[in-house]
């Protein structure tokens, strides 16, 4: 006769269902868009302040924004990306620059 614990062992079933139910979070690209008025130095400052890029990488991204119209600054989960976009846009407005930061699904 089978042991009662063998009949009631639901652990493998629950584990399988959990593995199938948990998906990795969606990722979003944070994008800086070019405009004709924001100084290049300010864009570099934003990249260093909000993304912790060194001066060389920040300058490369600033030039990408300038010449290609936009650049992906990083890829994050939705909450982190939305927060960065909001903080950057507020920082730009507080400093009277029209710099626009947006996000797109990666």
Curated annotation (Swiss-Prot):
InterPro entries reported in the protein's UniProt record: ClpS (IPR022935), ClpS_core (IPR003769), Ribosomal_bL12_C/ClpS-like (IPR014719)
Domain of life where this protein originates: Bacteria
Any one of the GO BP annotations: proteolysis
A Pfam family the protein falls into: ClpS
Signal peptide range in chain numbering: none
Functional note: Involved in the modulation of the specificity of the ClpAP-mediated ATP-dependent protein degradation.
Family assignment from sequence similarity: Belongs to the ClpS family.
Subunit text: Binds to the N-terminal domain of the chaperone ClpA.
Listed HAMAP family: ClpS
Name of the protein in question: ATP-dependent Clp protease adapter protein ClpS
Gene: clpS
């Amino acid at each position: 006769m089978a042991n009662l614990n063998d009949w009631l062992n639901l652990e493998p079933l629950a584990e399988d269902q959990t593995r199938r139910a948990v998906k990795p979070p969606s990722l979003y690209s944070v994008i800086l868009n070019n405009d004709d008025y924001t100084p290049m130095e300010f864009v570099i400052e934003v990249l260093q302040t909000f993304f912790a890029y060194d001066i060389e990488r920040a300058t490369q991204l600033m030039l990408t924004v300038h010449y290609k119209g936009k650049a992906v600054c990083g890829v994050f989960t939705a909450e982190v990306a939305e927060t960065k976009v909001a903080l950057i846009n507020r920082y730009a407005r507080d400093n009277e620059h029209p710099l626009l930061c947006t996000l797109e699904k990666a």
